Amino acid sequence: MLMKSAHVLVWFRRNLRLHDNAALNAAVASGLPITCVWVSQRPSENHNPRQSLFHYQAAQELHTRLAAHHIPLYVVASDEDLLPLAAALNAHTVITDEAYTEAEIRQDNHLWHNFDQAGIALQHANDRGILAKSPLMDANGLPYTDFAAYKQAWLQAYSGQRPSETKLPVQIGQNVPLFPAHTGAVLPAYQQSGETAALTQWHAFKQNLVHYPITQNFPARKNTSLLNAYLSAGCISPRLLAAESLANRHFEWLDKLIFRDYCY
């Protein structure tokens, strides 16, 4: 697996999609050959067999779609495996989505130090929220504690944030590894996982968004979006949902998305 030419390594975390993937876009913009990696279980996550299977299936679909471009997706067991992989791939830069939890931030600081010692840059992109978490601060430079004030600042800052198409090159000369078999518990699925299923669910939900201000109060009738699991895994871009909601004046649903950014 030792690579002679320089590569960029995209580390998938909670952005298991191709469409509107800022980390992938940054990798494409670098002009270097792209290799990808997914860590099968993050240290910041409590063991949840159903969630683990959902993420595994999303990564499996991602592996198949990347393979169509001859872009390999490696699977490693822990964050500590990232540096040896990056070194073997001759990766000059590792690009991943921005960390949000305290455990992730601590681990990223640790990884940044190790990567820096090895001469490898660790770069972050915003793929979890609509807006990156840092730009919105109050007049005192502190995070907002009032949602109404946050929403006004969010709407003012949003104008430049739009989903983007990720135009992946078809690479030559890269071997695509097999995706490993799932070793955890296999449980009945409440929802099909992956980007394709996420987009299908979104298209079905938005057909009835005009009625959402009323139907949102009747969750027993399946009038909610059923997108939470997909958003959590990053199978669908929140920027896409916000752009389409705003364009079609679905403001009640947009408020839910803004509140999601606020909670991050």
Tell me what each language-model feature is.
Residues 1-162, 249:
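Trp/Phe/Arg-rich N-terminal binding region typifying the photolyase-homology
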Residues 120, 141-264:
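Glycine/tryptophan-enriched, flexible segments
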